[in-house]
């Protein structure tokens, strides 16, 4: 009864997972983040046949979107920093929003140039999914936690999206046709950027789940090997039978080693291709937290009213960062599980073939030690969350210092320079 219930739960989670992934794929297609078509029979993404003319038009379209977005960033950020610069704190917020806009353009261009490589990595993930299903003899790989984390991340993304895009629908942004077109382009590019940023989180989550399934498969294999070493008369085997089983288990371990190697390489390829987007993901959410805190303090000082929306959005952006760090840390931890297993103890010195497979696999794990590093600067793990929190606290002290020294007060010098 329990196994039947677990099977139904696994099937339901797999159905939901496929539905959500298909929905994300269609959103990416609609936003032109992906131009590949999905072959459902082979479970692979195929590049659409494009002539040189279509490719030129695609590049031209990207350039137009980038130029329009770059020209519209004052309007896009006016809801946060205001339409006039009156204080030194306003200048600081302006510099922060400008840096986000510049990185958004860079992320957009890099993503457009690397679409073919991104498609290849996605196809390798899809091939690994099928290969792990065969090796582990499982029909459903995506557990309920995949659906939970996916929906949780989607909720935070939609909260931030509504908060950032709703101000663009003010009447002042639709006074003439040029502003209407510009607003539409800005929303289009921002949604495409958010889609790519969510893919960063999703890739690490999928890698972690695949690593977890492979680790569980090795644990189950070691459990099945226990009768080989058993001294109980009821389970004792002939030497020939032991050698036969150990050869089979050695072949199974070799296949696991091959999958671990491919999973290591595909995770690193994913990280390398999207490392600028991952950096932008971290920077965007961090700067948004800073801007929300700035907006909160500004309203508190000027209007004597507390804007709780700013605080809520700051926590939403922090949750985005925490989810990314947790998924990256989860992937690394799951990749190291086999090192903690007694592979070199179970059935050691009983068969040379098995001993060699274990030695090769453990050596491979030592060589292919997974580290999720962005641009060689920092590791994505749970410890990085503490670094982000300390940076936010430091920024709060800077804001407090600005307030004490009159940084939030209107300055004639600033007004004269930016009017």
Curated annotation (Swiss-Prot):
Keywords: Cell membrane, Membrane, Receptor, Transducer, Transmembrane, Transmembrane helix. Residues 1-55, 112-145, 206-277, 327-383 are cytoplasmic. Disruption phenotype: Disrupts fly aversion to caffeine. One of its GO terms (biological process) is signal transduction. The keyword Transmembrane applies. It is found in: Cell membrane. Residues 77-90, 167-184, 299-305, 405-419 are extracellular. Its main location: membrane. One of its GO terms (molecular function) is ligand-gated monoatomic ion channel activity. Pfam families: 7tm_7 (PF08395). It is a multi-pass membrane protein. In larvae, is expressed in neurons of the dorsal pharyngeal sense organs. The chain crosses the membrane at residues 56-76, 91-111, 146-166, 185-205, 278-298, 306-326, 384-404. GO terms for cellular component: axon; dendrite; membrane; neuronal cell body; plasma membrane. Belongs to the insect chemoreceptor superfamily. Gustatory receptor (GR) family. Gr93a subfamily. Gustatory receptor required for response to the bitter in taste neurons. Gr93a cells respond to bitter compounds such as caffeine. Flies avoid bitter substances, suggesting that Gr93a neuron activity is sufficient to mediate avoidance behavior. This is Gustatory receptor for bitter taste 93a. It comes from Drosophila melanogaster.
